[in-house]
Amino acid sequence: EDGKPIEDVTLKEVHIIKVGVKAKAFDAANIFINHFAELERIEKKRIQKEQALLKATKKKFDTQQKKSTLLSSGLQFLVTEKGTGEKLKENSKVLINYTVYFEDGKLLQTSKLEVAKILDAVDEERKANNNYQPIRADLSANAKMITGFKEGLQQLSVGDKATLFIPFYLAYGETGNAIIPPKSNLIFEVEILELTK
């Protein structure tokens, strides 16, 4: 090809010649160092905020768990705000908001965009697809749902807000799944919005 060297060319050295007052005053090395120092400071601040949120969330759940009701299955639940609606039954179908955490207070998933924003955990793709929405839960015997979640919801009434402490054997068991490690105890915050058909 025209203009292309026959043999590969290797660049061994670059000399930058500063021309003009502004160019001579420009301290690239210092700007480069300061840029990365600022990125490091921002990351450190983000980690501190995340750890403070994690600690506060864990403390809240530890306090709630001490006040919770323990069922014979090992499930614990605490109604944090009592609703005035109908008690849920085994075959109820309900619309709920939920937020699920790992036992250490780390967020796993939520149906509420405002919770994801507070916890700095917004999934932009999920947001773009308008998937931060309440979910429909079928409490019938054959419904596909983790046992502890179903049992916990059956303790509640429409309008209730509650925290469910679900031991691993009533959740995803000894094997876990793609995003939940084996033997993970889970904590759900739920709000029963309404009965559905």
Feature locations, PLM:
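Cross-family detector of peptidyl-prolyl cis-trans isomerase
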Residues: 1-197
